[in-house]
Amino acid sequence: MSSLDPSPATSTQQQKQLESLVNLLTQGSRFYRKAYNELFSGVTTEQDPDSSTNIPEYMLFGWHLFLMLHLRSPELFKDLVSCIHGLVAVLAILLIHVPAKFRSFTIEGSSHLIKQTEKGVDLIASLCHNYHTSEERLKEMLHKSHNAIEDIFHMKALSASECKPENLDKIDTDDLMYFKGLIDMECFQSNLEKMEKLCNSNSCKGELDFKSILINNDYIPYDENSTGDSTNLGHSKCAFETLASPTKTIKNMLTVPSSPLSPATGGSVKIVQMTPVTSAMTTAKWLREVISSLPDKPSSKLQQFLSSCDRDLTNAVTERVSIVLEAIFPTKSSANRGVSLGLNCANAFDIPWAEARKVEASKLYYRVLEAICRAELQNSNVNNLTPLLSNERFHRCLIACSADLVLATHKTVIMMFPAVLESTGLTAFDLSKIIENFVRHEETLPRELKRHLNSLEEQLLESMAWEKGSSLYNSLIVARPSVASEINRLGLLAEPMPSLDDLVSRQNVRIEGLPATPSKKRAAGPDDNADPRSPKRSCNESRNTVVERNLQTPPPKQSHMVSTSLKAKCHPLQSTFASPTVCNPVGGNEKCADVTIHIFFSKILKLAAIRIRNLCERVQCVEQTERVYNVFKQILEQQTTLFFNRHIDQLILCCLYGVAKVCQLELTFREILNNYKREAQCKPEVFSSIYIGSTNRNGVLVSRHVGIITFYNEVFVPAAKPFLVSLISSGTHPEDKKNASGQIPGSPKPSPFPNLPDMSPKKVSASHNVYVSPLRQTKLDLLLSPSSRSFYACIGEGTHAYQSPSKDLAAINSRLNYNGRKVNSRLNFDMVSDSVVAGSLGQINGGSTSDPAAAFSPLSKKRETDT
């Protein structure tokens, strides 16, 4: 750890990497303790049963051996899969050397060792079966462990078949090694003390006390229901602060975890939970069995697709894969590049790890590319793959997505997103175009990796795609000319995407097969002039909790965006990745930018629909869900500049409060924020630091950020007031009128979010049929004129005019009695259909099921009256 660059420019990234490392080792130590307790009894040697640590000495010995193994295999601390392989190797050594009397099982009929050979139990194969590890990698870890033991204790490894120790009875000893005196009673204590001294000396040189992680893992909270699909930083910071300081005491962390109830004690059989370790090992098994067996070059069918283009693209594709993956997983560059990416390639032990990840990513890329080619040819609108297969941006996005999935599979902590984007010259908006297609065309993708891609897409949609330098603005300036001036004023346009030669020059190496003239730039595809490049961004930590969704085709376009004859057509990928100014090859007069922006906005609306519904449920105003959604949709379509350099949750919060003010609900901004903090995606900076422009300080433009109240009053209200006022102009509740379709007033109407769980009415008694529905707003509230309302916010305000919040007994009583439940806030495409978010939402409890944009028809008249 001391080798990390302590400069301020990299301190934030280093802090996150250290926290991720603590989280990785915490997960590994939990796995190790659980596996050890399944294989061995609690008390070993002459350890005092009342020992303050409650850690069996054999367990402690194995943990120290694992830490020593790290010195020979740095990849153990790079990703969770490698870490587990090292720990399973340690368990194998303990099973070979620890006396059989300390085992918690017998060889005969054991459920732990089920793999058999003619000579007995196959120990290594059984462990690989139990923990989903690779037998080849496990044997490699065992070999490195043997070398570490020889160096530390000056012992020579002997063949177990020659020594024939008693504790290996009925175990096939072929290829097993044995160390005499390693764990014998007479020398075990001295060996353990020697290991502890070595670990303590190494801890003093670094910043973390790795030994304490084994003891502290019961103190660090852990959610057994966590899917573990991405690195969990929720509690690692607390652990890091404790473990990084040698002065912190740990005696309050030594509680022994209680065992789950057994059926004999009245409990039920516990179902195995998906933990970060089981998730990582399951996805690693998929990568090993499905992807690793593939060739590391294009298949014959893919070569046929590539050679059938206007020119043979096979060599260009393979060359690009080599260059781009070398940029992501550097193996030949200097140590300086390694530090910038968190990958210290100066260490020779890192090169095999990076090479292995490159091979896995390339195989996955070729597999998905072939599947996409097959699917595109089945599209009636595509008869030539040349535009797609010659598009540089498409290939880079597909390679970057493959590399990110490989990193996610191994649960790596040394390269954190968006490092993949920075290495390849892509932007978040670029990557968002490929994720849905990647999931659709890789049918064997495990559920956990689909969840990871869902979480990644949420990050891209909610904020990263709206950052300065995103290629989103290069498409917006074409699709929405009205925002061009604001984009240019703020300098939001992306830089051109760097060519492959630029990537090679960054690597400071010469890739075999490149032209001898580096100044001749390789074509970046047909949209070279518009290809953007992402500026550097700070690493965003991954979500802890995500929800799997089924990626579906985008909803049909609005009439003002595309002709009616094209609504049902599926746009090919070449339309998505083509230059924004190119005409859509499907037909019509629209540009490819129109297609791209429409698809992107439809995804934004789907994500916003789920988050709005969840937040409205939390604040108990479900009846206003559609109004909030409609205001958000109108802002996205007509006041798109409000999203520039911002997070969509900032607009959702403001829309909810604006609707609450218009409808005179008893809801304050403080209540909204308190409930928002309970959402899984919540980050404090979302409502505490919002961009509202730049100021000139001594000739330097400095971004100005304010709190959400200031943003709401100064920026949001002036822009969104017409949409909020239009809610009042629509008149009374729809159920009090007869709609155009002839629906009877007051009759039930399908919910605008029909597949989402309805919070009203709610059953409040388990023994009686008693239901409670939210109180409707009175007609009097809706008939109030706009001039009598205040659109502005103040934290701590009363819910009614001239009334103190302390006297609002109804609101206080409601908050006291509300039993809030955790609502899943992740994007789930199964829950909201495309037709719902495409504009076919109906009014709650009545009204037409037509496009809700009709509710804003008198918008222009309303603006005139207000002005």
Curated annotation (Swiss-Prot):
Q: Provide any one GO MF term from the record.
A: RNA polymerase II transcription regulatory region sequence-specific DNA binding
Region described as Domain A:
275-476
The segments labelled Disordered in the record are 512-563, 734-762, 843-867
Q: Name one GO biological process term.
A: cell differentiation
The places in or outside the cell where this protein is found are: Nucleus
Expression sites by tissue: Ubiquitous.
Which UniProt key words apply to this protein? Answer: Cell cycle, Host-virus interaction, Nucleus, Repressor, Transcription, Transcription regulation
* Pfam families listed in its UniProt record: DUF3452, RB_A, RB_B
InterPro entries in UniProt:
Cyclin-like_sf, RB_A, RB_B, RB_fam, RB_N
| Compositionally biased intervals (Basic and acidic residues) | 530-540
Q: Does the keyword Nucleus apply?
A: yes
Q: Where is this region: Spacer?
A: 477-594
Stretches of Polar residues bias are at 541-552
Q: Does the keyword Cell cycle apply?
A: yes
Identify the stretch(es) annotated as Pocket. 275-722
Q: Where is this region: Domain B?
A: 595-722
Q: Name one GO cellular component term.
A: nucleus
What does altering residue 654 to F do?
Loss of interaction with RPD3I or CYCD3-1, but not with RBAP1
Function per UniProt = Regulator of biological processes that recruits a histone deacetylase to control gene transcription. May play a role in the entry into mitosis, negatively regulating the cell proliferation. Formation of stable complexes with geminiviridae replication-associated proteins may create a cellular environment which favors viral DNA replication.
Record remark: domains = The C-terminal domain (743-867) is required for binding of RPD3I and RBAP1.
Subunit composition and interactions: Interacts with RPD3I, RBAP1, the Arabidopsis cyclin CYCD3-1, the mastrevirus replication-associated protein A (RepA) and the begomovirus replication-associated protein (Rep).
What is stated as this protein's family in its record? Belongs to the retinoblastoma protein (RB) family.
What is this protein identified as?
Retinoblastoma-related protein 1
- Encoding gene (name): RBR1
